[in-house]
Amino acid sequence: VVLTIAATGSEMSNSSVITKEDGWIKRGYRNDYGRPRFAIMNPELTMTLPDYQTACGCTDILMHTLERYFTNGGNMEITDSIAEGLMRTVIENARILINDPKNYDARAEVMWAGSLSHNGLTGCGAVVGGDFASHALEHEIGGLFDVAHGAGLAAIWGSWARYVYKDCLPRFEKFAMNVMRVDPEGTADDVALRGIEAIEDFFRELKMPTSIHELGIDPTDEELKLMAHKCSIGCKGSKGSAKVLHEEDMYKIYKAAL
């Protein structure tokens, strides 16, 4: 692999995505036979990326760690610390790249973070290996509409987070304080919601969408129901660890994300 964009972590992951245009189905596939043995990682190769693609990449990197962070059960403090440090690093360096896209050090930090975020390291110890409901929800958006994966994730994540956070409150509170550095005053609910708002504000800094309409698409209610149905089928009926989602939950999240 010769890495030209820091985003999906393909250089160290066992994951891939397959799109079937007949029926507009987009599905993830994981197999260790697909994990590269060798990768060339030169941050200079990412310096010509459009700002939008850089922002999408930074968002995707964050999401790969967020998906593994918000789980119920089996979490390890050392893994949490690695994940939190990685997310803080991505946020800090993404902000640098907004104004200085050819900053070598920032490009290098983001590139290495992308590799570590999706090679399994940030999920070590979690019982189910991650939540990944946001990815499943976005895959249906990306399957039906022409949207960048990172942008789709940013558009759906806030609505997903507000829908599930009460079922995974200690993790959301911890994320808010340790990653987003929000004011810890108030109830756990207050802190968790401030954390969700803080990361949405960060997405806006990157000019990423925080709603489906901001993706430039306007799905009908029938299309929302279709996406929820396809997502449920693709997940064999349910998805998630922070909160297990079923088809009706998925529809409600899509609806809230408009």
Question: What are these regions, as identified by a protein language model?
Answer:
Residues 1-78, 174:
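A glycine/threonine-rich phosphate-anchoring loop and its flanking beta-alpha core
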Residues 68-198:
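Active-site segments that bind and position negatively charged phosphate/pyrophosphate groups
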Residues 172, 179-258:
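C-terminal charged capping/lid subdomain of soluble metabolic enzymes
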